[in-house]
Every structure is written in C-alpha cells, then in structure tokens.
C-alpha cells in the first residue's frame, strides 16, 4: 500500500496514531470474524436439518397423494408471518417468530375424517418451508458479513499495518539522516572556524 508521507514529525505522529488504531482494532475484527465463521457453520447445519425435515414432510404428504385430490386447498392459507431482528456479531439478521394461518371453516360431518390431519400436515409443511427460507436468508447475510470481515482482517494484516510500519521506518531514517547531516555539518563548520582563528593568530 502506497502511503503518502511527508518527512516531518507531524506526519510521523499521525502515522503512528493510525498504526496504533489498526493494531488495536485488528484483534476485535479477528474475534468478529471467528464468531461469524462459527455462526455461518451453525446456520448451515440448521439449514440442512430444515431441508431434511422438509423432505420428510413432503414424503408424508406424498404418501397420502391419492387422498389429496379430495382435499380443498382453499381451506388453509398463510395469513401473516411475524418477523423479528436479531444481532449476531454485529450483523442484523431476520428471525422468524411466528406464522399465522387462516383456516376456513368446514363441515366436520361432510368432509372426510382425515381433513384435520391434512390441515395439520399442511401447516407443518408451510411453517418448515418458511423457516428454511428465513434460515437461508440469514445464512446469506452472515456469509456476506464474514467475507467482508475477512477482507478487512486481510487488509489490516497484510497491507495497512505493514505499509504504515514501512512508512514510519522511512520517515525515521530520513529524520535520523537529516540529524546526522546537521551534526556533521556543524562539526565541519566548527573545525573551519577554529582553523581560521588559528590562521589569524
């Protein structure tokens, strides 16, 4: 990283301050990255479990496939999905709190006996599918945040901190060289003045 530097004490102090900020911030960002990595892993596992549960529910649904031709699908519909927001390692993610279903009244005497079980099965199926979608959305947000945090860690570790250290080293060398030149020029001037005094005397 090419850092624009001025070879003076003010620039030196500013660069030291910026370096300290990055060195102090790096462990915090690393902790956030590891927390996000763990959360992504947990979220992937949760998504896989929900996928498996959804497959089992679909298989149970397909087992009664012949009966579903009689079922009135307009009896049940999703009325509302209640959302929440949760912060995970500083990242706001959606949280499924509840799913409200609207069940139209039907005649218990005229409808087949298994309708109640069918409605229950459809509720479970819909709830699991909605929960899976929320988990996948959460996973996407967490993975994006983890990638950004990893990029920031790499930027600090591999580019900015070494860049600032290099710039500080250059400024310090320049200032030391300038000081040495100043001292040596003073010595030369002093020795020339002494030679003149000796020549005059």
Describe these PLM feature segments:
Residues 1-201:
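Charge-rich amphipathic alpha-helical interaction elements
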